[in-house]
């Protein structure tokens, strides 16, 4: 799967970069295109190299044990323990035990899996690094960004250099995984399919940018990072912000919000699973809106992006209604807080809903009962962020 994905991406990159801008001297355009082609080729080579490295380590372990397939660690929601802990916790026997388990599950490439119990037993030789066949390591569902933050806090609390070393390896994976255009795939090394899209879904871009922002500032639990690491993180963050601005969707001449995924080359909103359409998304975009408002001295472009996204939320909010997961219709409730559909149709801003058969509907009641019960089609999470926006807007009024 990976080889096909990488080859396709490389071909698209080369094809896209053969076009020149008439306003740009041909020599400049050609040089830029050639450099971008080299950048993408190097990126894909890094992905292949790290994938081979991860596979080789596990293969060597299995061979030494006389096994042909790895055992699996215990699955769990998130990581099996409360990750919001005070610094003193990392000095306790329980904190040290869990952090040792986290160290054991770090892949040779530097990342971690999702839905893997990291509060139970440490990873054993010949055991997979996560519960899934693919997507190891990943940035999905807070994986890798969560472990990196925990390691920084553990090092701050204990001074154990193992935590710092593992932190640095994880940080390097984030830097290596960043696309030349500034975005991140869901998993790296690349695994193909929609997982290779630039991913806003489940706050993935947000989570990685928060880590980089913290490293770049070098304060609190990140005060141990070197000046070089801070500068590198800042440069990576700036590339990510450029990608965020470039992927903010323009609809009918107006800046709106973002998709859950964007194509890694065209930067347009892209489809993921059958019921996750190429669309504007309220749930994922609000995380990015929130992050942009944390930046000191935001540029005019970022200020405009925030105001535009907030205006879109105001224009698309649903009032006087509630929805209970699984129900086929909305319920009238006059004093209900505003809510939003998860997905909005590109170009029309109409709420849309998908199903496992790739069908798209304008009413949640048209979706199968299984998907109505198994997916969050509406959200009111933007309300809290929009309250913060009201204060932010006074400090940074729209030009």
Predicted regions and their residues:
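Terminal, non-catalytic domain-edge segments
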Residues: 23-94, 214-239, 265-272, 276, ...
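Residue-level signature of the C-terminal ends
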Residues: 105, 154-157, 177, 215-218, ...
């Amino acid at each position: 799967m990976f080889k096909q994905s990488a080859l396709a991406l490389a071909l698209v990159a080369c094809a896209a970069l053969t076009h020149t801008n008439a306003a740009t001297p041909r020599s400049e355009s050609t040089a830029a295109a050639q450099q971008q082609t080299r950048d993408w080729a190097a990126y894909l080579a890094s992905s292949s190299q790290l994938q081979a490295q991860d596979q080789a380590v596990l293969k060597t372990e299995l061979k030494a044990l006389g096994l042909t397939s790895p055992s699996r660690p215990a699955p769990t929601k998130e990581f099996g323990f409360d990750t919001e802990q005070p610094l003193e916790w990392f000095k306790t026997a329980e904190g040290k035990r869990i952090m040792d388990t986290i160290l054991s599950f770090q892949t040779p490439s530097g990342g971690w899996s999702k839905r893997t119990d990291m509060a139970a037993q440490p990873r054993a030789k010949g055991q997979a690094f996560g519960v899934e066949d693919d997507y190891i390591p990943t940035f999905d569902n807070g994986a890798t960004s969560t472990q990196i933050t925990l390691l920084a806090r553990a090092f701050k609390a204990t001074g154990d250099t193992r935590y710092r070393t593992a932190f640095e390896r994880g940080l390097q994976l984030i830097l290596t995984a960043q696309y030349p255009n500034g975005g991140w795939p869901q998993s790296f090394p690349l695994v193909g399919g929609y997982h290779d899209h630039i991913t806003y879904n489940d706050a993935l871009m947000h989570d990685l940018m928060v880590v980089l922002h913290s490293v770049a500032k070098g304060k609190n639990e990140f005060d141990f990072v070197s000046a070089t690491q801070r500068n590198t993180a800042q440069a990576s963050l700036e590339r990510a912000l450029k990608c965020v601005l470039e992927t903010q969707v323009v609809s009918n001449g107006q800046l709106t919000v973002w998709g859950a995924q964007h194509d890694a080359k065209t930067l347009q909103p892209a489809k993921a699973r059958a019921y996750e359409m190429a669309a504007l998304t309220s749930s994922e975009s609000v995380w990015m809106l929130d992050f942009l408002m944390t930046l000191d001295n935001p540029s005019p472009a970022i200020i405009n992006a925030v105001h535009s996204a907030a205006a879109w939320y105001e224009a698309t909010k649903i009032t006087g209604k509630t929805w209970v997961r699984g129900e086929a219709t909305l319920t009238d409730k006059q004093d209900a807080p505003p809510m939003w559909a998860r997905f909005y149709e590109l170009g029309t801003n109409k709420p849309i809903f998908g199903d496992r058969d790739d069908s798209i509907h304008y009413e949640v009641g048209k979706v199968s009962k299984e998907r109505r019960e198994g997916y969050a089609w509406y959200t009111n999470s933007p309300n809290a962020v929009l309250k913060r926006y009201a204060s932010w807007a006074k400090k940074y009024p729209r030009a």
